[in-house]
Amino acid sequence: MFAFYFLTACISLKGVFGVSPSYNGLGLTPQMGWDNWNTFACDVSEQLLLDTADRISDLGLKDMGYKYVILDDCWSSGRDSDGFLVADKHKFPNGMGHVADHLHNNSFLFGMYSSAGEYTCAGYPGSLGREEEDAQFFANNRVDYLKYDNCYNKGQFGTPDVSYHRYKAMSDALNKTGRPIFYSLCNWGQDLTFYWGSGIANSWRMSGDITAEFTRPDSRCPCDGDEYDCKYAGFHCSIMNILNKAAPMGQNAGVGGWNDLDNLEVGVGNLTDDEEKAHFSMWAMVKSPLIIGADVNHLKASSYSIYSQASVIAINQDPKGIPATRVWRYYVSDTDEYGQGEIQMWSGPLDNGDQVVALLNGGSVARPMNTTLEEIFFDSNLGSKELTSTWDIYDLWANRVDNSTASAILEQNKAATGILYNATEQSYKDGLSKNDTRLFGQKIGSLSPNAILNTTVPAHGIAFYRLRPSA
């Protein structure tokens, strides 16, 4: 086996440069919500957004934290005589303000889309050079979130400085409106966005577009994993490809500014249940936004129970906001049909002194995997409290909603109330501070100094744990 080790330095670049917690007071935890693009692309309408919001609410997902309803590309019909954007009246007959009001009246937040280019990616009017009037359009329509893409940028890229100023123009324009608007950059990680994004935005994409494949290589996503400075980000990037590119970037993200690994593919395509669990777990662990990409009106029971796993979401919404680190990576001989095979261990600190740990199996067969306190607390010195204490192990995927119950909720034969965690009534921060057992998983054992944590991990699957100091 060929080993790769990625241990983050004790003093990260974020610490050196003193990145502020949030440039606009938003994004104190990674955003959660739904975006239409992965499933519907340009097939958008007022009815789709409002029906989807109602369904998210009925399924209890809004109260789990999925508050942003994000309208992606293809909503515009052009500009009016004053240069302001105009919504397509066939798709949105009552206008964007009506959509915003409906969502706000039902305790959602409204997201819209544009591009830092002459056109959007689908060829509609972009905002390059028109940042102030477009920002005012979004504010006038009571928008709470802007996804800002990178197509048709007139060649204004190639150095961090050029890209920074192109995206800063919209950041400044949004702030000038006086309306708090979450600013989500979608420039595919071009020009090292993770270095400069936190000063002007709340999240930033760090790779090409995701596809519903766990490991499959694709020539349209030409850079391999760990090529974090990809000159051509592309699209159709697999889950493992994006995850590996994100591995060294956690030190540049945190409260107020997050690495965005792209929308979730849980419930999209033909991923296995183990692949969907691994995908959701790792996005949660590295503090990526949790944006549902599926059609919530046609979710499988197993996918719904993944989206509603409170103990995993609590890792993502942890107030400390520190992305986990990949501690080790090995290539393995049992490769899958695409010639891919690797195993990894990730670890990261949590706000209340706990630690999150993942053993990820990218091989083609189930296998025993293990780790130790020395690996889990890789920055701790010998004799430290972390390495000389006993830790209780909690399985974060235990107590998952069973398929029968999930199906009953999806078929509206049973209410989600009382079954799912309600973060509207009690935030994840408050639930964690009060030791709400729903957020910690199920205790399965303990790990003492010099002992080994052993488990069997399914192919393309994960073992996902919270470690808590033993009483």
From Swiss-Prot:
PROSITE patterns xref list: ALPHA_GALACTOSIDASE (PS00512)
Predominant location: secreted
Enzyme class, UniProt record, top EC level: hydrolase
Glycosylation site residues: 105, 175, 270, 370, 403, 422, 435, 454
Keyword Secreted part of the UniProt annotation: yes
Residues given in the record as substrate binding sites: 72-73, 147, 205, 251
Cysteine disulfide partners in this protein: 42-74, 121-151, 221-237, 223-230
Gene Ontology CC annotations of this record: extracellular region
GO terms of molecular function: alpha-galactosidase activity
Enzyme Commission (EC) number: 3.2.1.22
Biological-process GO terms, alphabetical: melibiose catabolic process
Reactions that this protein is recorded to catalyse: Hydrolysis of terminal, non-reducing alpha-D-galactose residues in alpha-D-galactosides, including galactose oligosaccharides, galactomannans and galactolipids
Transmembrane portions of the chain: none
Leader sequence residues: 1-18
Residues the record marks as active site: 149, 209
Protein localization: Secreted
Membership in a protein family: Belongs to the glycosyl hydrolase 27 family.
Protein name: Alpha-galactosidase 6
Organism of this sequence: Saccharomyces cerevisiae
